[in-house]
């Protein structure tokens, strides 16, 4: 069963910021996807989360790993693709060193016209041979527009030519002739002001460019993205003639040649055959009855949606762009219309792990992101309610922007070694501000080149550093270290005559054979009208798994594998037997693991949906700040439903009035939300 992050009410499966039942009517049935899956599948559901420094699974943290002591015995030296080195010390502690995992994901932040720097990053990736290794691209706002073009197979040179030559102002023009004429006249006056009034001309030009285009429908922008992405995909198909023999690829090519649009499903299929084409994730902000919720468009949620349409939605900068009305998407009810705003409102830096809480069988990272965020966005987080400017922004946008930015920046700290800050404060000026960067749609070509060169240098430096970086992990035993390795790493160790690695490989092979038998038993029952029950065939499988769990490390590995995201059948079984008396140690451990994951996701979303929006409302007194921080601390360590409810009850019982002479609020969104988020024990 998919772990949901909401109270047990209906839920829109597209959203990543779920609403409790008191705040929003049901929009769809609960998803049955498993927990902790890849970004592409997880973004279809509502378990997207933004968390502080990737809060640890406290319930699964054991005593601190002892420090290595005594002499070290080298078990393996620089083996395998990641040049793994494994040592064992006299006190039994094992130490693992290996190179960084492959770079497979590019994350592009929103920033309006600041995105003019992005061609520098793509050039650096291409020059360093890293672009083809990128398998997915994720973008918000202007980053979503960039991601759509790049995921279509556009190379660094093509992208720079398009980006540098794109007249962003004209792409915001109205389709009505008289209105468009007025907009062009204002632009020409602005150009003259810039030329003849050096002190105030730039600002005047900006105002005359933007104000006449406020609430633009930006249809020309969507058309450019549609046309250019189609051209890029067709160019890649032509460059790989061998793939045209695939009927599905030929069908896509025919559709595009007839004027059709590139869809998310097209990119997913083509990415399996053409490395230059990537899977794509683009954020949008859905305004459900005034309540903002993040939606991530991708091949899992919206396979038939035009990527140009999604990029238009994501780039709909508040006030400047008119909200985009969307209907007939898989996550919408029949006849439902939803207004969308800029994807950066809810998450401007859409890092996969900040959207989908990853649960793994190993602490070792299997892949890396390259995260591009713009200089000047860090700031220092206040400890409470937004200042006037932040409160005004929240009101204008209709979303808790201040709280979301702080959540985002705290979560990004956990990905610092995967992040490159786009340089915007240079000797040629400060392009990190709203007027100097975000809305500077008439940025001169020499400035664009300058910013691109700076970013090229920054990304190249990052790639050079990560190529020589080594990660180090310490484990309490050699068994724990070996169980943290993937099969390829274990095979490399076994080839170096590591008998223990061979034993772990054999254990996994035997376990997977039993897993297959268990799956057959579950599928067989699913073919009958009766509810899933724990039968003799399943009981036999778990008896075999119990025998394989010859030590705590192997039992833990089995429990986590049974909770693996890709196996819906095992998830279904664990949900069916939860709450029943269980004899199998492995099954009991797997159920406990599922419960810990459920609680972790729910607790994190309470922090995101209840605590932070309340914490950053204007006028919070010290008592409320202390209360909310205490609840946050408790939720970070919660492993049971009772502990989650205890933290919520603390808020319900002690939350005070803001800016009022009386102590208790007459009505409170925070208290009502806390009540709605209580979960069954």
Give each language-model segment a name.
Residues 1-37, 41, 679-681:
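Non-Sec secretion/translocation targeting segments of pathogen effectors
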Residues 29-107, 284-290, 634-646:
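Small-residue-rich anion-binding loops in enzyme active sites
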Residues 48-70, 89-98, 156-198, 381, ...:
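Extended charged low-complexity segments that act as oligomerization/scaffolding linkers
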Residues 62, 82-83, 90, 99-107, ...:
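Patatin-like phospholipase
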Residues 208, 246-360, 436:
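Active-site gating loop/helix substructures
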Residues 231-251:
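Short secondary-structure capping/junction motifs at helix and strand boundaries
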Residues 347, 374-376, 397-681:
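C-terminal helical/tail subdomains of lipid-metabolizing enzymes
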Residues 350-377:
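A short alpha/beta connector and helix-capping loop motif
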């Amino acid at each position: 069963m998919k772990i949901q992050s909401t109270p047990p009410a209906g839920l829109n499966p597209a959203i990543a910021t779920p609403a409790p039942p008191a705040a929003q009517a049901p929009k769809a049935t609960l998803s049955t996807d498993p927990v902790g899956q890849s970004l592409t599948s997880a973004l279809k559901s509502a378990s997207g989360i933004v968390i502080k420094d990737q809060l640890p699974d406290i319930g699964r943290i054991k005593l601190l790993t002892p420090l290595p002591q005594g002499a070290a015995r080298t078990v393996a030296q620089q083996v395998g693709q990641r040049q793994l080195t494994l040592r064992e010390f006299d006190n039994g502690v094992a130490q693992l060193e290996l190179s960084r995992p492959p770079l497979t994901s590019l994350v592009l932040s929103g920033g309006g016209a600041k995105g003019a720097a992005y061609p520098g990053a793509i050039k650096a990736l291409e020059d360093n041979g890293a672009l083809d290794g990128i398998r997915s691209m994720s973008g918000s706002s202007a980053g979503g527009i960039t991601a759509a073009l790049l995921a279509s197979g556009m190379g660094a040179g093509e992208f720079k030519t398009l980006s540098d030559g794109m007249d962003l102002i004209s792409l915001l023009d109205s389709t009505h002739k008289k209105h468009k004429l007025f907009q062009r006249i204002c632009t020409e006056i602005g150009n003259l002001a810039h030329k003849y009034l050096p002190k105030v001309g730039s600002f005047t030009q900006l105002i005359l460019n933007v104000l006449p285009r406020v609430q633009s429908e930006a249809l020309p922008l969507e058309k450019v993205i549609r046309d250019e992405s189609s051209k890029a995909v067709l160019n890649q198909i032509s460059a790989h003639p061998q793939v045209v023999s695939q009927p599905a690829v030929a069908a896509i090519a025919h559709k595009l040649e007839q004027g059709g649009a590139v869809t998310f499903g097209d990119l997913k299929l083509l990415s399996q055959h053409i490395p230059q084409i990537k899977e794509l994730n683009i954020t949008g902000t859905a305004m459900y009855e005034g309540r903002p919720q993040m939606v991530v468009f991708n091949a899992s949620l919206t396979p038939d949606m035009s990527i140009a349409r999604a990029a238009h939605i994501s780039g709909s900068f508040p006030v400047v762009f008119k909200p985009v009305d969307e209907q007939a998407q898989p996550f919408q009810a029949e006849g439902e219309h939803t207004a969308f705003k800029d994807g950066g409102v809810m998450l401007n830096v859409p890092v996969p792990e900040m959207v989908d809480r990853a649960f793994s069988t190993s602490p070792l990272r299997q892949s890396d992101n390259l995260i591009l965020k713009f200089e000047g966005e860090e700031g220092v987080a206040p400890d409470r309610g937004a200042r006037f400017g932040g409160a005004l922004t929240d009101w204008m946008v209709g979303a808790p922007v201040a709280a979301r930015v702080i959540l985002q920046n705290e979560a990004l700290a956990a990905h610092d070694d995967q992040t490159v800050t786009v340089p915007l404060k240079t000797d040629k000026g400060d392009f990190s501000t709203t007027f100097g960067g975000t809305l500077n749609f008439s940025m001169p070509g020499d400035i664009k080149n300058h910013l691109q060169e700076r970013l090229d240098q920054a990304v190249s430096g990052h790639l050079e550093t990560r190529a020589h970086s080594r990660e180090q992990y310490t484990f309490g035993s050699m068994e724990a270290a070996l169980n943290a390795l993937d099969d390829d790493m274990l095979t490399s160790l076994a080839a170096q005559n590591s008998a223990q690695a061979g034993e772990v490989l054999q254990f996994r092979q035997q376990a997977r054979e039993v897993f297959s038998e268990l799956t057959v038993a579950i599928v067989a029952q699913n073919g009958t009208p009766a509810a899933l029950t724990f039968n003799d065939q399943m009981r036999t499988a778990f008896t075999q798994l119990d025998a394989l769990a010859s030590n705590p490390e192997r039992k833990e590995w089995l429990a986590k594998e049974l909770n693996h995201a890709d196996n819906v059948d095992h998830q279904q079984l664990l949900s069916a037997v939860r709450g029943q008396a269980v004899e199998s140690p492995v099954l009991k451990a797997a159920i406990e693991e599922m419960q810990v994951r459920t609680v972790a996701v729910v607790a994190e979303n309470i922090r995101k949906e209840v605590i932070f929006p309340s914490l950053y409302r204007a006028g919070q007194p010290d008592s409320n700040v202390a209360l909310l921080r205490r609840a946050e601390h408790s939720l970070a360590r919660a492993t049971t439903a009772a502990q989650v409810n205890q933290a919520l009850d603390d808020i319900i019982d002690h939350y005070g009035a803001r800016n009022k002479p009386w102590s208790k609020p007459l009505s409170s969104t925070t208290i009502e939300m806390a009540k709605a988020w209580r979960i069954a024990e």
